[in-house]
A protein has these predicted regions:
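Beta-strand-dominated extracellular/periplasmic modules and repeats
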Residues: 2-243
Length: 243
């Protein structure tokens, strides 16, 4: 006989695997580079040690420096492009807030160009935009940052291949091994449907990687607003890149 849950207890979710949340496979032939970097053997489970379960909990800011929540005010001038506000929550499988989560942000500029030396596309570099930021979730699991909408860029996977506009997010938890990486796309971008990286995540899970336009987050006469919640695990989890 199954024991009834205590009043107010959270529901039991049962067995869960990465594929339940649409996590992309390590091998996806349309994404060409996965054909030569995907493991040839099944992954081996490893027991966690002190290295994996410990880390600078509550001390990330002391190690990494102060948060950089406004990417439009890092240099003396103003970056080119459409200013946007991105806000959301980091949640667990029961949609409870996860405070003190570090979120690293990196992206291309409005022309689709990254600032790093290995980006050799001839789109212009914006001297007033680094494309990198970092925020920390508050006690309600909420985060917010200001940036410019990134541009699309070619990436050489196949003829006329273009990556849709996206923002990379890396989430760091209480331990060194608790790093999850995902991307946020934009709801009006036609390139999502033909992008192999995005399409490695099947529908309907792919939709969890698309930010929602939110007029309530828009700053009048200044910036558009998008909402993007991140669920860390469970059947409603945001798809993350493979570990």
């Amino acid at each position: 006989m199954t024991k009834s849950p205590e009043p107010g207890a959270l529901p039991t979710l049962g067995a869960f695997a990465d594929e339940d949340a649409g996590s992309p496979p390590s091998l996806f032939p349309d994404y060409r580079s996965t054909t030569f970097r995907s493991p040839l053997q099944a992954p081996l489970p490893m027991a966690q040690t002190l290295t994996e379960v410990s880390g600078p909990a509550g001390c990330w800011e002391r190690l990494m420096g102060a948060a950089v929540a406004d990417l439009t005010r890092q240099r003396a001038g103003t970056p080119l492009g459409q200013r946007i506000v991105v806000q959301g929550h980091v949640l667990d499988e029961h949609r409870r807030p996860v405070p003190h989560t570090i979120i690293e942000i990196w992206q291309a500029n409005a022309a689709g160009r990254y600032i790093h030396a290995l980006d050799d596309w001839d789109a212009p570099i914006d001297p007033n935009f680094t494309g990198a930021g970092r925020v920390v979730t508050d006690e309600e699991g909420r985060y917010r940052y200001v940036t410019v909408r990134p541009g699309a860029y070619p990436w050489g996977n196949h003829r006329n291949a273009w990556r849709p506009a996206h923002i990379h997010l890396s989430l760091l938890g209480p331990a060194f091994a608790t790093r999850l990486v995902t991307q946020m796309y934009f709801p009006d971008d036609p390139l999502i449907e033909i992008d192999p990286i995005a399409n490695a995540v099947p529908m309907p899970y792919r939709q969890r990687m698309v930010g929602r336009f939110d007029i309530g987050l828009c700053e009048p006469n200044w910036a558009l607003g998008y909402r993007f919640d991140v669920v860390l695990k469970g059947t409603q989890a945001t798809p993350f890149q493979g570990e």
